[in-house]
Amino acid sequence: MSPTSETAKGGRRLVIVESPAKAKTIKGYLGPGYVVEASVGHIRDLPSGAAEVPEKYTGEVRRLGVDVEHDFQPIYVVNADKKSQVKKLKDLLKESDELFLATDEDREGEAIAWHLQEVLKPKIPVKRMVFHEITKDAIRAAVANPRELNQKLVDAQETRRILDRLYGYEVSPVLWKKVMPRLSAGRVQSVATRLVVERERERIAFRSAEYWDLTGTFATGRAGDASDPSSLVARLQTVDGRRVAQGRDFDSLGQLKSANTLHLDEANARALAAALENTRFAVRSVESKPYRRSPYAPFRTTTLQQEASRKLGFGAKSTMQVAQKLYENGYITYMRTDSTTLSDTAVSAARAQVTQLYGADYLPPQPRTYAGKVKNAQEAHEAIRPSGDRFRTPAETGLTGDQFKLYELIWKRTVASQMKDATGNSVTVKIGGAASDGRDVEFSASGKTITFHGFLKAYVEGADDPNAELDDRERRLPQVAEGDALTAEEITVDGHATKPPARYTEASLVKELEEREIGRPSTYASIIGTILDRGYVFKKGTALVPSFLSFAVVNLLEKHFGRLVDYDFTARMEDDLDRIARGEAQSVPWLRRFYFGEGDGTGGGGAADAGNGDGDHLGGLKELVTDLGAIDAREVSSFPVGNDIKLRVGRYGPYVERGEKDAENHQRADVPEDLAPDELSVELAEELLAKPSGDFELGTDPATGHAIVAKDGRYGPYVTEVLPEGTPKTGKNAVKPRTASLFKSMSLDTVTLDDALKLMSLPRVVGADAEGVEITAQNGRYGPYLKKGTDSRSLQTEDQLFEITLEEALAIYAQPKQRGRAAAKPPLKELGTDPVSEKPVVVKDGRFGPYVTDGETNATLRSDDSVEEITPERGYELLAEKRAKGPAKKTAKKAVKKTAAKKAPAKKAAATKKTAAAKTTAAKKTAAKSTAKKTTAKTAAKKATASKTSED
């Protein structure tokens, strides 16, 4: 029976969803007897501070928002910004005869539905309405087939929320006292931060190895074509039967893993190349194997985040935001899922499109099934796919921008999942010969031809490694047979150096967390966002770089809260929480063991001590945070660099120091905030210490009482005010300190307080023209200028900023605007130096709206970006995305020659010992010196939020 005919008998139904966008879409599918309203997310939560806790609660309950002495009873309060919405829902409920709770079908959605029921206290029938796609048929089916609330899911979500509150509110204050105020710890965020820090430690300990090899271009002697090339390129594989070392044959200290491998240095490689000049080569073997590649499974949350990062340059958060919009507007199924399963309807829709778009030859006789799911999956139960029983092609959707790109990605992946395998042949050709000195050499070439593209016709998965070959890439070799003679047209001597392990990107960090079974797919985007916001990591291009602050935090947690950041322990916690969700374990006993350490197996054992699967491996958090006297704050935040220099993380950021504070030979210098820990060498530290102190206190602003200091910053010397401790640094109430660059005629050692106050008073209002449009004098990266509306004019000197009169300004505007460089508009915002191009990045106003540019690459701001809010990191990310999409640069083909040599990169010095926060390699000295001249505008403390707790 349809919803419309049901309500025709009388009655009014209230349907509550999370978001207004979702409400708007669903409303169009239901009849006039339905009222669809949004809760606008969670309406109730644990209190964010003691001020929100009802007065009847005192002591620990007031601090934590959880009564740990009475079965961990949570104290819920209606969010201040949701009170008016709750009143609206209650008013609508009074006029309704039935309530449908239509929140998302996952654990979080079930909790929202339960909180709505608890707060609204309906006296009418209540039904739980679930669906995983917003289509007319799906919504009507959900109305016709409601269910009861799943209390197990509700309990599981509540347990997670309480656990995260206890973890955050008990451990975070330790960080405030021992490292820096306003930091945070979290069940998953701290482990994710540790992963990034450990990868940087590996890079710090890494020693590069130089190795050489030979590459030969061999000709068959016959004319070739596209299907049968006339030559092939092969790499030297063995010399006298010993395999020639490649990068994978060296360990992280630059040593060969096996003595049986031949390590060629430059001299030996060149000598061998010379000995091969007149060698006669022949094909020794041709091995052909069938090639088959099956389609990739449809997307789940994490694979969508990873692929959107690789192919579209989206961060995890951006991917989920775009996917949320697509879901709410009825284009895709629910985007938080661990499943790769497709419904029968979806399989039929995908197979129909395969036949329609690619033909019956691309359709397998039987539907493909993808039953594999992540362990303990508790999210929605179908893969992410286009919605409906007939998939709209991307062109049919009318979508634009990021929504179009992500929909197209999902659509292609889904359709491809129901196509035939790609098939072909892979071939390996071995080419041998004898050098003039008698040594036997063997070169090897591999090829691949695809005879039937199958699913590759529709979709090819990206790769995290930029050097990895994609599945649809063919390498055709000449048709040769064993014994065929070949001529060496060119023997190239190639030098290489092993590289440190790559830093995590958002995509690879998500993959790592999932493989370790830490956290849940629905939380990964927010976790990465949190560690970026807290200043624990920052981005260089797409790489996630740990800050020195994160080294201090992880150092403390590892030494004093080892269990809490142990990977296996965290995964077992996740497993226990899922057992609670399935009803196989009880919440309160588990929380009691976690917090108080009750139960067997908790007598101080390490995180690796496995329990019986019922939480017995948990220790007592309360006891861990009670005795803090043993934690030496200075020790956990100090890291040796070398030459008696230490890197320390202070309340206002990292610095290097030699000697004790009160000693006569004491030296101290700030470390640039954007310096990667693996770039801090002894040489760079010495250079920093040799420079004058970075901060010059000029005095106090009489108007505000704030201290005014001069600094040598990343973009040159500047003055700024020091805001009082406790001033909000993030969020809508954030306060930014006044800052201004020094004039070219000024220097750090001569600038005065009066100079600083004048500089920080800019821009100066000069006056208004006859039409009342304000004219201001401003100082920018490209010099002083006047601004009137969107019309800007350059000034000749910096002094004019304070001296120019209204009459003089009007006279300048009365002149025709100059063309060429002088006519260029000043930037809307200056972001800093791009880590890739090393050029200044600015925001400009273009014909099609604001865009970021470094002078070489332009990238338009997206719909959810604004000139006022865009950060330097976001600007660099947009440019990196644009570069990734651009055409690859073509290099001119070199003339054929007999012997050529490519110089290996300079080998790192391996003599100097490196420690957790220092790296002394000659190869990095130059880069480190360059970086030393820069410092970011934001410190780690500025990035930290005032929130005590964190989700996960």
UniProtKB/Swiss-Prot annotation:
Keywords: DNA-binding, Isomerase, Magnesium, Metal-binding, Topoisomerase
Catalytic activity: ATP-independent breakage of single-stranded DNA, followed by passage and rejoining
Region (Interaction with DNA): 184-189
Residues involved in Mg(2+) binding: E18, D104
Any one of the GO BP annotations: DNA topological change
Ranges of biased composition (kind: Basic and acidic residues): 871-884
Record's compositionally biased regions (Basic residues): 885-906
UniProt cross-references to SUPFAM superfamilies, sorted A to Z: Prokaryotic type I DNA topoisomerase
Subunit structure: Monomer.
Function recorded in the entry: Releases the supercoiling and torsional tension of DNA, which is introduced during the DNA replication and transcription, by transiently cleaving and rejoining one strand of the DNA duplex. Introduces a single-strand break via transesterification at a target site in duplex DNA. The scissile phosphodiester is attacked by the catalytic tyrosine of the enzyme, resulting in the formation of a DNA-(5'-phosphotyrosyl)-enzyme intermediate and the expulsion of a 3'-OH DNA strand. The free DNA strand then undergoes passage around the unbroken strand, thus removing DNA supercoils. Relaxes supercoiled plasmid in vitro; in the presence of sIHF (integration host factor) relaxation is decreased.
UniProt name for this protein: DNA topoisomerase 1
Organism, scientific name: Streptomyces coelicolor (strain ATCC BAA-471 / A3(2) / M145)
UniProt gene name: topA
